[in-house]
């Protein structure tokens, strides 16, 4: 068995222990970042006088050959390859010779090497996730614009509450996703720092220029403390927290649409492309994609919880427990890379049913408007709330809708009711009264959409 550390040991590793500790099965996906970091390191130690220019160039040439094998799918992982670092260095030695390949790791530890790989990988995947999130926001804007004229019940406690435009509901998710995007940008300011050169825990003894390394790797700055650099994974925890919050937002969207797909609601119909059938019941059209979007939130929360539990009691500095960070990170990123484009496709291709939404509107949704009517007549709101409660009870006693309650009945409860009360019973007027910023009036939503378009086009 070939390892990077075997000199002081008199016994070979137990095969059971080797299988248990090897991480090549999952960290191999860091191959490109690992090679990129190693090329930058070769340049850095050449600048520090530890390599000749010819040695540097030969190392870089060999590393690019290893990269080409990974890219073409021809790289062969050996049973002795402990992790991606071991695998790449082993293959590099086979290509350019072990003596020269052995110089590459001068002054470098796998502790700063792996965290460099992860930060490089995370930077790339975060950019792709950001693009996918923006596309989902664009899908929300498209649906909001198309559904501007559609009125529907808004809900609290899953009970019909007030009439709103479908566009207001859709834009609610846009703004959740906008905050998700801002959180991603914010966390990446802290994640996008160069750790290379921190060594195992105490720094580098060869005067390697870490700022030049950072520039070479595209990092805006370096990490500031070697012990902190190699031992903490808070940047991954932030990413997993972000992923969990975004997952919850996707779950809430899925929960709404899953409910609305039922025959009892009938507000939307999913595309056949995003539905499945039953192995027993031929009539079924199941919203499996939505249900799994909802279920994946639990997975993302689990990824965060798992890593929090791993790091909570670790003494400084590096511990092999931190090997557990990558599977959680990869899982969260993979989950969202699948979920975000699917959610966008569901929104774009579902059919909404304005007639069913309109049919769900009933006079009781205008009870607040009736209370507001009395407020405009000079009654304090708390009193108007109580008065309208009595009106609702009287309509229920008579078994008629609120709008059909005779004026005489209304005036028996409050003399402030007059002929103009009939104007209350209009859903379009109701939504148009809510024209304050953020409200459901057309003009207010148009302002939101205009703001949203600027944000996705920045």
Please report, for each region that a protein language model flagged, where it lies by residue.
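A structural signal for small-residue-enriched, beta-sheet-centric alpha/beta enzyme cores
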Residues: 110, 223-227, 363
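Structural signal for hydrophobic packing residues in well-ordered secondary-structure cores
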Residues: 46, 63-74, 92, 96, ...
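Glycine-rich cofactor/substrate-binding loops
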Residues: 1-37, 281-458
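A helix-coil-helix interface module used to build multimeric assemblies
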Residues: 1-203, 208-215, 276-277, 292, ...
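Charged, flexible cofactor/metal-binding loops and thiol motifs
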Residues: 118-119, 123, 130, 145, ...
């Amino acid at each position: 068995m070939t390892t990077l550390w075997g000199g002081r040991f008199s016994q070979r590793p137990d095969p059971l222990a080797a299988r248990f500790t090897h991480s090549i099965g999952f960290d191999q996906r860091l191959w490109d970042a690992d090679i990129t970091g190693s090329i930058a390191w070769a340049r850095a130690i050449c600048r520090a006088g530890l390599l000749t220019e010819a040695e540097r160039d030969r190392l870089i040439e060999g590393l690019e050959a290893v990269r080409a094998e990974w890219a073409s799918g021809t790289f062969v992982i050996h049973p002795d390859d402990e992790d991606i670092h071991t695998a790449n260095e082993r293959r590099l030695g086979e290509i350019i010779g072990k003596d020269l390949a052995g110089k590459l790791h001068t002054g470098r530890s796998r502790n700063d090497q792996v965290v460099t790989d992860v930060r490089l990988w995370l930077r790339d995947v975060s950019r792709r996730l950001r693009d996918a999130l923006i596309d989902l926001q664009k899908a929300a804007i498209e649906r909001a614009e198309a559904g501007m004229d559609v009125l529907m019940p808004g809900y609290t406690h899953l009970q019909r509450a007030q009439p709103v435009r479908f566009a207001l509901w859709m834009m609610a998710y846009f703004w959740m996703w906008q905050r998700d995007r801002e959180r991603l940008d914010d966390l990446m300011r802290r994640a996008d720092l160069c750790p290379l050169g921190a060594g195992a825990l105490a720094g580098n003894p060869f005067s390697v220029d870490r700022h030049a390394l950072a520039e070479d790797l595209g990092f805006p700055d370096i990490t500031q403390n070697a012990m902190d650099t190699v031992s903490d994974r808070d940047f991954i925890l932030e990413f997993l927290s972000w992923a969990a919050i975004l997952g919850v937002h996707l779950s809430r969207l899925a929960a709404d649409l899953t409910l609305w797909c039922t025959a009892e609601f009938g507000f939307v119909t999913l595309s056949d492309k995003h539905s499945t059938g039953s192995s027993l019941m031929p009539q079924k059209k199941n919203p499996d994609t939505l249900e799994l979007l909802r279920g994946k939130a639990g997975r993302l929360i689990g990824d965060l919880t798992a890593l929090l539990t791993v790091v909570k009691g670790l003494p400084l500095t590096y511990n092999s427990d931190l090997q557990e960070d990558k599977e959680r990170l990869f899982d969260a990123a993979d989950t969202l890379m699948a979920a975000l484009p699917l959610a966008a496709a569901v929104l774009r291709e579902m059919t909404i049913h304005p007639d069913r939404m309109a049919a769900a509107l009933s006079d009781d949704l205008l009870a607040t408007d009736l209370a507001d009517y009395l407020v405009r007549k000079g009654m304090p709101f708390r009193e108007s709330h109580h008065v309208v409660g009595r009106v609702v009870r009287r309509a229920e006693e008579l078994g008629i809708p609120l709008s059909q309650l005779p004026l005489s009945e209304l005036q028996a409860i409050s003399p402030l009711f007059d002929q103009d009360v009939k104007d209350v019973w209009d859903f379009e007027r109701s939504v148009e009264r809510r024209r304050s910023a953020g409200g459901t009036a057309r003009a207010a939503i148009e302002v939101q959409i205009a703001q949203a378009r600027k944000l996705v086009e920045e």
